[in-house]
Amino acid sequence: MKKLLLLFITTTFLFWGCESTTEPQPIRELNKAVIVVNEGGFQAGNSSITTYSIEDKTAQSDVYYTVNDLKSLGDTGNDLVIVDEKGFIAVTGSNKIEVVTINDFKSIGEIDFTDFGGPRNIVISENMGYATTSNSALVKFDINSLSIIDTLNLGFKPEGITSADGKLFIAISGWGSGNSITVVDETAFKIVKNILVKENPINICSIGNIVYSISTGTYSYFGGDGMGMLTKIDAKSMNIIDTLQIEENPGRFAFNDGEELFVINGNGIVHISGKDMSIVNPTLISAATVNNISYSIYSVGYDKDAEMLYLGNPKDFSQNGEIAIFDLSGNEQERFDVGINPGTIVFKK
């Protein structure tokens, strides 16, 4: 739990320096690549993009900054969704969704969220985008015109969002006090159900018509037991199918089409079978193996073609981090450098 306390204190209160910006190098267009959104420091305005070529195993830093006339991406890049040739980046502290051409990261526009609070997480469905915000709103926007279509008030502090069976499933974290998944009909844009889950649901995904949500639970240093939970939901009926307890405050996770989940907790990476709702390996990869400074893993991505895990190492949360690549047996393959606090890992194939 000391590891998680360090993570909480550091990411909440520390002000970071800027990622180094050496002489910009020419940016290659992306083919098979890993894209890392580095959050940067809290209120430091130094969020950045790192790309990594899977084919030649080389990384390029400060990509957005370099191709956009040395313009900063903004404060706290929090999510990235790719649709066709566009990338939609939630930049929470700058109250915007930045829109880029995904092959070169040139800016083609932005969606202003000043009136709704910083965008947190994004999902795209049927040419419409949906974003949760720090002011407890759900914002619907057109991905072609980049105009806001509608807004809906949600419960306190919504976080993760996914789409399944014509519905949006939204984790209502309440900064730790929330305990529900709100379901919104996409066509009517109305709340149709609230599903009660364990405290502090933050991360959510869908595989077909099955929705998986991770509740982080309460932290022991706040009087909690540190026990989180995976909740499996049928998207059609909107009913809970099964639950699975996970120790050490689980958080972000990645998954594959076989319903295997790779969940970050205080000890490292937990390997879970979603089909069986069972823990395959409680510590597939230890946090200390990835990060020997603060013993914390910050993000996780899964390359389904190579069957590799990409793990974000924030080091001490104030210096540039790295991505560590592991196979599914827990063996390290390689690492590459990224910016400060690598929080989102996306694959472009």
Q: In which residue ranges do the predicted regions lie?
A:
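Sec-dependent signal peptide recognition
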Residues: 2-8
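Predominantly soluble domains enriched in secretory-pathway, periplasmic, or organellar proteins
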Residues: 4, 19-349
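C-terminal motif of bacterial Sec signal peptides marking the signal peptidase cleavage site
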Residues: 14-17
